[in-house]
Amino acid sequence: MNCYLCRQDFLPGWTLSNVWTSQTLCPTCKIEFVKRGECGGCEDCGKPGLPLCPDCQNWRNQGRRLVTHPLFLYQTQAKAFMKRYKFLGDTALLDVFKTELKKVKVKQDWIVPIPLSPERLRERRFNQAELIARMMRGRVRLVLERTDGVAFSHQTRHERLERDNPYHVIQPVTGKTILLVDDVYTTGITLHQAASRLYEAGAKEISAVTLFRSV
């Protein structure tokens, strides 16, 4: 069979324990996806290194702690994946992570993907965070909307931290335990802004899951 990512032929290593598991990556590509849990790091965002990174310490000092569970580190092969999935629209490639996403067990009433602006959604035609969320076990609810069209990838770190909060809650969330979902955790500003709006609207507890954590 062909590897979903590098498209090279490989022979799946079937065993009694994985015979019902989809093997979509060749061994070479698979080994390059480093699971966040294998490297320790920040207990709030998964950044490799210190038990609590400076960014998360700063969030805590502001009274805005948010525990995020990234599945993998954002390294070379992960970047190649995101280029094809997010920017080239190869959404079928997400099947690579179906098994890992189904394993996620975080307390929640609703799974809430980070939304795109209407302009960005028309341009891309899909929300990459929503597709990730729908592969997880739980009830997905689109309770947030985003009203600007400025992509964070085109902003400096200072601009990301200083900009106005673009998110708005469009459905009642009072008393709900919410699991936010996004594709890549970089500075944390996206998830923290979304969480802030949800808390303002009455959410009880919020945590997050991302597919990748930048390093």
Give names to the regions the model predicted.
Residues 1-215:
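Glycine-rich phosphate/pyrophosphate-handling loop used in enzymes and phosphotransfer proteins
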